Amino acid sequence: VVYCNARTTCPSRTTCCRSPFGVWYCCPFLMGQCCRDGRHCCRHGYRCDSTSTLCLR
């Protein structure tokens, strides 16, 4: 289990991400990169594009 804060958890081998509105969500990748839109994320070693919909290396 990954602890995002005192009340929110994500499954093991995932990453906690926080949306711009303060809502936590789980990225399905270990050490994932959270995108600014608060909905998407990328694998470790990749980054989100400006639209937060594509992952770039």
From Swiss-Prot:
UniProt-annotated location(s): Secreted
Post-translational modification remark: Granulins are disulfide bridged.
The entry's keywords: Cytokine, Disulfide bond, Secreted
SMART domains (alphabetical): GRAN
Presence of the UniProt keyword Secreted in the record: yes
UniProt keyword Transmembrane, yes or no: no
Cystine pairs: C4-C16, C10-C26
Pfam families: Granulin (PF00396)
Source organism, top-level taxon: Eukaryota
A GO MF term: cytokine activity
One of the record's GO cellular component terms: extracellular space
Tissue expression notes: Ubiquitous.
Family: Belongs to the granulin family.
PANTHER family assigned to the protein according to its UniProt record, in alphabetical order: GRANULIN, PROGRANULIN
Function: Granulins have possible cytokine-like activity. They may play a role in inflammation, wound repair, and tissue remodeling.
Protein name per the record: Granulin-2
Organism of derivation: Cyprinus carpio
